[in-house]
Regions:
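Surface-exposed, low-hydrophobicity beta-strand/loop segments enriched in small/polar/acidic residues
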Residues: 1-130
Length: 130
């Protein structure tokens, strides 16, 4: 596989991670661990406000020679993210807030996430992806 021809053929769901191009919302190593959404073909970023989260950024690589930024995204796991806005509750769902955090999902959204615990003091939510 060459850079510029990224494919996900053959990746089994048990792998729980895959490589993606990174959009301009992701700027460096400090974004590792933040929730990401699909923003274009084979591309992830922080997504628009309310976008479905597919996982978290597991790695960051600036391939200067190829002029692309790439990262690994993990999606089969438990994670803790900072949230904004209304406090989620256990059993609710979250979506992207467009700035590298999550927020309480509206009706019918964020169904691939399940809130397990909420720390309202530190604005941190524990979720599992399903």
């Amino acid at each position: 596989m060459q850079i510029g021809q990224l494919q996900h053929k053959g990746i089994r769901t048990e792998s729980a991670a895959a490589s993606f191009y990174l959009d301009t919302s992701i700027t460096g190593y400090s974004d590792i661990g933040k929730p990401v959404s699909i923003t274009d073909d084979f591309t992830v970023g922080f997504g628009a406000d309310g976008a479905e989260i597919i996982g978290y950024l597991e790695s960051y690589e600036d391939r200067i020679t190829e002029t692309v930024k790439m990262g690994g995204v993990n999606w089969h796991m438990c994670a803790e993210f900072t949230y904004t806005g209304t406090d989620p509750t256990a059993g609710s769902h979250v979506v992207a807030d467009g700035a590298g955090n999550v927020k309480l999902a509206g009706a019918g959204a964020g169904l691939n996430t399940l809130v397990c615990a909420v720390d309202t003091t530190n604005k941190v939510v524990s979720i599992i992806f399903r």
